[in-house]
């Protein structure tokens, strides 16, 4: 079985699980309770399979996938808002943990860490929540991710809405990996880009794991 097919089946199984749904639905008393065209699992699969085409084209394509009556883009957007972002976070972490990780460097996994910034849609809600100062014109997010270089996949990410300290996010991510049952006993070498070195980060990683700081 191809890896892509296995991941899709794993995601479908998780998204269909009642316990998983109850953790990640915004309003457990009313969301996805009545019989509707779109189920929780449907919305998950739509969101993951979105190719960033115009909304109505994506809706038409997904309607054909469901072999059901045509579903509007507005209906998909409304249904997506009923699911917490934590659902996708857990799906990402679980599928990454189950992926093959056979390629190593002299027995070590090579993990590279880097950060990025991005802009969010300039809506009143996001501007109110994520603009930290009056001078902020556009709501932004900050993310730091860990990439398994030899196995070519992301294994962990940390997001912060607004301006963040990349070193602090990297430390939290390292702690999460170090405590994760899938990774904690694996020999690892972590590689950090030039924006990460500092006295605190060097001291922290030196005590925690083998590290290369650019």
Question: What is the predicted role of each segment?
Answer:
Residues 1-50:
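Dynamic "connector" segments at or just before major functional cores
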Residues 37-83:
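Short, positively charged, Gly/Tyr-enriched micro-motifs
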Residues 44-46, 71-76, 110-118, 145, ...:
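Short, conserved catalytic/metal-binding motifs centered on acidic residues
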Residues 97-105, 172-185, 200:
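A short acidic-Thr-Gly-centered motif at the start of a beta-strand
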Residues 134-181:
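Electropositive, glycine- and tryptophan-enriched low-complexity nucleic-acid-binding patches
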Residues 162, 200-203:
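Hydrophobic, well-ordered beta-alpha structural blocks that scaffold small-molecule cofactor pockets
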Residues 205-211:
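Conserved small/polar residues in nucleotide/adenosyl-binding loops
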